[in-house]
Amino acid sequence: IPVTFNNCRTIYDMAEKVSRCLALDSASLISLLQDKRNLAKYGFSLEQLPAMFIPNTYNMFYDTDEQEFVQRMANEFKLFWNDARKAQISRIGLQTPSEVSTLASIVYGEQSVNADEWPIIAGLYLNRIKKGIKLQSDPTFKFCWGDQLNGVQRLLAIHRNIDCPYNTYKIKGLPPGPINMPPSAVLDAVLNAAEVNFIFMCAKPDYSGRHNFAVTGEEHMRNARIFQNWLTLEQKKKKQ
């Protein structure tokens, strides 16, 4: 039977979706995944574990158990990370598939709709990593808050100030693991990141979900001001 999981933020989301398709138990799957011996066997830390699961539709038997499911995912991970893709990792300045997955999860957190922006956003963040600039990605501190910021349009300094190893406003470089399970197309977009000079991005003042990219801080501040003014007007309209 087809087993599909996508738009998963955590291994808990993934286990829940998989348990609806197969006879396995989501709680048993989670405890198996968190078992230190299993993590060591597959070569992941708990934080990196989401990288092992590449969203797709997989054909499996209904009676696939937890152990068989995890082994199948480990096999699919190896198939995806072939020699050609592995060779791309160092070319873009990263070291492991887990790092690629972590960056891809940030790219996907920033942009889940317009796929043409993925390589640009990836290039922008790789520029920040190379220059030693904090990534300052909003989806990373949102991840720290769990579901508490769902539906919040205007994110504030108080939200960004959360102490959390995933908050890229606080830490330098990549967080310890992915903040969601990015589709394979996003992983490939990171491996084929666009060579751009951009350092900043800001949402466009419309409902397109697209971004204005900038090279300088001044340009970015202008974009940010335009967006904040637009957001204020939109919120006033809704109140009328």
Regions found by a protein language model. Name each.
Residues E16, L22-A27, N38-Q240:
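Bacterial extracytoplasmic/cell-wall-associated proteins, especially those involved in peptidoglycan
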Residues I1-P2, N6-C21:
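Membrane-embedded segments
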Residues L33-R37:
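Structural preference for solvent-exposed beta-strand-turn elements
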